[in-house]
Amino acid sequence: MLVSVLVILFVPWHQESNFSLVNNTSMHYVRARVLSVDAESLQSDDLEPGRVAGAQEITVQILSGSLKGQTVTLTNYVTRSVNVVCKEGLRIILCIDTPENAEAYYTVYNYDRGGGLLLIFGLFIGIVLVVGGKRGGFSLLGLAYTVFVIFAFLIQAVYYGWSPALAGFLTVLLTGAASVYLIGGPTRKTVAAFLATMAGVLCAAVIYTVCAAALHLSGYNLDTAESLILIQNQTGLHVSGLIFCAVIVAALGAVMDVAVSVSSSLQEIHQLNPDRSAKELMHSGMNIGKDMIGTMTNTLILAFVGSALTTVILLKGYGYDMALLLNSDYVAIEVTEGIAATLGVILTVPLASAISAWLFTLEAKKPLQSNPSKKKRRTGCLARRFSSLFFQNLPVKAHSSRCLPNGNCLSR
């Protein structure tokens, strides 16, 4: 893990580029606190009870940036899409536009959610540590490493022209190995879970590749393809492989969950009953995995449906009929991603069962040894003979012994 972090941080593996889709050099975002609401004209929204619309005259104090400490007065426009209602003491994000040869223009961008997010993260970390203990701490370390690899390596590599498939598989390899090792340590269970995870992700990748070829899908079918092509012209971004990369990264979490659960269960069964054969262990793993398949399948499908819900509603609002909706690029991409990831999870169950059963029952053949009790008796007899040669004059307890032709000695 440490080596990969150092490589990602210090090796110049990407080219520098200052390309941006928009020219926002004149815009700055700073934190601010509302000192007072000087005047307001707000009306209730008839279509959405509890929301208001209108305008407010507010005075704010800037808390960050080069203008820290200054006080400004501005108009806050409250609309349905930008609905930030200011009150005294509220912390907000302020947008400062400073074009050339013009006065600075201030607008309320959004709520300052930094403190709330820190509180939520702290609560999450605390619960994981309390419930999970030491292993919970290792899982948090694995999560931090995963986030680091995604933002510091995957996004940067794909943006600057790396193959999305290569960058995606390297990300899966690094994060999968680190997460599984931190959870299980250097054990056969860890090896089994890691191999099953890689095999499951590979299955998801193969299934997506076949489905994408059959449905004529690529990154150019994304809604954001036009903007991505502009980036491609400047940085060498490979638009066509973006969906493939997204599928294998999205499938990693669920596949790893199933692989670790199955391998851990089979390790426990093997420790309680070491005489079970590999076939019996695999059968037990399949029985355990069948219950997991139903819940994990629902989880993945519902996750993809939830992410696509608002877009499908929007398409329906445009008057798309069912046939047109089902044949749209967006629905085809979402369905293909969901099916590929789900089938990868399902196939992980037999893969994890087979790999775990094989590894747990893999024992080195031990050479045949003579009866240890006979060896011990022979050793004792030789010891007494050795003692009689060198310690004849020492007073010892009287005893007599008779050695048989086979080397065993009888004492009386």
Where would I find each of the regions flagged by the language model?
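Hydrophobic secretory-pathway targeting helix
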Residues: M1-N24
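Helical hairpin unit composed of two closely spaced alpha helices linked by a short loop
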Residues: L252-V262, L266-V312, G319
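Extended, hydrophilic extramembrane loops/domains of integral membrane proteins
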Residues: V78-G115
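Hydrophobic alpha-helical transmembrane segments of membrane transport and translocation systems
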Residues: A303-K375
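Structural detector for short beta-strands of small beta-barrel domains
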Residues: S26-G54
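Pore-lining and gate-forming transmembrane alpha-helices of multi-pass membrane transport proteins
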Residues: A193-T197, V201, Q232-N233, L237-V249, ...
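Transmembrane alpha-helical segments that form the functional core of multipass membrane systems
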Residues: G122-V128, K134-I229, V239-A250
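Positively charged N-terminal leader segments that act as targeting/secretion signals
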Residues: P367-L368, K375-F390, L394, A398-H399, ...
